[in-house]
């Protein structure tokens, strides 16, 4: 919010469209909905004409409805949280949870990620405390999985013998594209005799774009993920591939404009009836909000061949 406010103070209506959109969303995030509405109207006037104006009016009605909703959930801070980032929890084996954390558990001088000055993310596992429904005894996940760069966003097969997760494009060294960007990739590991094997990247990865945030359908036959690959509608879209009998994958399919916007869709999660995801492109309260859609309403675009 602070830096977007400085930009707007300096440039006002000449502020770039992308920055104007993000500034409006940051205002939502701090509860300044009145000013956010005004800036979103300015954003839409600059972006297009009457059709967008009608959409803006509809969005305001939806937002007003959200603000009038009664709270339905109690939110508790778990004991495994630290002063660093913790996110992307996933149940594992019935009584454990695997999650990503930048928690510094080393006695040595830990390498830090320059973007946020926090240690690199690793996967941790914690046990469920049946009495309190909290989590305890958090430990780092397998040494075969965690590296000196980022690992996060894990998904497990129904039998817990296969896992997918997000990692920097890192083999023996950090790989970059032609513009010098190190992308994210999805990796897969299988468990043999109770031990996780060295992970291998999935076939639809590329050195030229990112894939991440894997999520498996309950039967393990579809893998949903996030990417900015060619054919994306926005900054990051949600895609799906079929997991075939031999372990290979179909070509990625975009979930389409009912789900994906020109902005960011991220962190998909699937149960038997609904897809849940985060977005800053749909109408919400600011930043990334959580949305849901019933499977019956999904209209998935044709396959995209990235070979």
Name every feature range the model reports, one short phrase each.
Residues 6-8, 43:
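Canonical positions in the second alpha-helix
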């Amino acid at each position: 919010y602070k830096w977007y406010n400085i930009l707007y103070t300096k440039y006002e209506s000449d502020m770039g469209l992308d920055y104007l959109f993000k500034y409006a969303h940051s205002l939502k995030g701090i509860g300044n909905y009145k000013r956010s509405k005004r800036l979103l109207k300015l954003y839409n006037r600059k972006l297009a004409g009457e059709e967008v104006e009608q959409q803006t009016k509809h969005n305001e009605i939806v937002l007003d409805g959200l603000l009038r909703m009664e709270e339905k959930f109690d939110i508790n801070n778990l004991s495994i949280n630290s002063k660093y980032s913790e996110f992307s929890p996933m149940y594992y084996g019935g009584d454990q949870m695997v999650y990503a954390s930048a928690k510094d558990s080393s006695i040595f001088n830990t390498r830090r990620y320059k973007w946020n000055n926090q240690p690199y993310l690793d996967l941790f596992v914690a046990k469920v405390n049946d009495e309190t429904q909290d989590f305890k005894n958090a430990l780092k996940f397998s040494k075969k999985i965690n590296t000196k760069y980022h690992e996060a966003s894990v998904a497990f097969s129904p039998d817990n013998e296969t896992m997918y997760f997000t990692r920097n494009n890192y083999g023996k060294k950090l790989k970059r594209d032609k513009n010098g960007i190190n992308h994210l990739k999805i990796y897969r590991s299988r468990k043999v005799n109770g031990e996780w094997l060295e992970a291998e990247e999935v076939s639809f990865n590329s050195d030229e774009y990112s894939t991440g945030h894997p999520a498996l359908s309950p039967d393990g036959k579809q893998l949903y993920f996030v990417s900015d690959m060619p054919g994306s509608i926005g900054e990051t879209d949600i895609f799906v591939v079929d997991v075939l009998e031999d372990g290979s994958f179909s070509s990625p399919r975009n979930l389409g404009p009912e789900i994906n916007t020109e902005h960011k869709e991220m962190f998909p999660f699937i149960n038997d009836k609904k897809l849940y995801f985060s977005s800053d492109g749909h109408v919400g309260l600011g930043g990334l909000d959580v949305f849901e859609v019933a499977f019956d309403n999904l209209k998935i675009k044709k396959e995209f061949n990235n070979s």
